[in-house]
Amino acid sequence: MRIPFLRDLLQSDSIYICNNITVNNLKPMASFLGKLGNPELGGLPLKEFKHRQALHKQAEINTMLDVPEFIHKAHNIYGYKHFINDVGGSLCELDAPDIFEILSANTIILYIKASAQNEDELIKRAITDPKPLYYRAAFLEEQLADYMQQYQLPYVAMINPDDFVRWIFPKLFYSRIPRYQAIADEYGYTITTKELYNVRNEKDFLDLIEIAVARKIS
């Protein structure tokens, strides 16, 4: 709205902005979630950041609650035999047991446990290209206080948004691992990235699920 020409067109409904969200392009959603910090560097004030975090959490919960309906539509409208719910990593942060009851009743929950090498690669990728992330409220409060103290920053507006993501991601990543495992232990099954790399077709995948199930009940 800083450009008068575009502002006039938007306010008169002469043009509109539409997010092009697809299965392979979730950047509009990530852009809305945003990063915390200096507005001049693209960051958000703490109050607005927390507001968007809360919206993201509720949206993710609602999406998981819709999974049974999505399965029904996939089968009856599109004729798909199988349904894969490729959930985001923040699923373990939602603290909403109801969604795991629904997911376990309608899908097979698989936790893909990363090797040490894969963990290093994921962290390096996040540091190289820091992206917006969802944080549990208590985790954010604790880590933000540590960051502000460590770098002696009196105001959130002084935070470099990308630097904060680079700093917090490894801590977030390792805090999530026991949460993933707890979900798998109670509601699902665990496979490893090494096992998954060997999957080449549907039969391999189904065989791997059988192995995971047998491993848990043995």
Regions found by a protein language model. Name each.
Residues 81-83, 106-111, 188-191:
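Hydrophobic beta-strand segments of well-ordered beta-sheets in folded domains
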Residues 96-106, 212:
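Short, surface-exposed basic-aromatic patches at helix termini and helix-loop junctions that form
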Residues 1-98:
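ATP-dependent small-molecule kinase phosphotransfer cores
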Residues 86-87, 102-149:
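Conserved phosphate-donor/acceptor-positioning beta-strand/loop module used by diverse small-molecule
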Residues 76-77, 130, 157:
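Long, charge-rich C-terminal accessory regions
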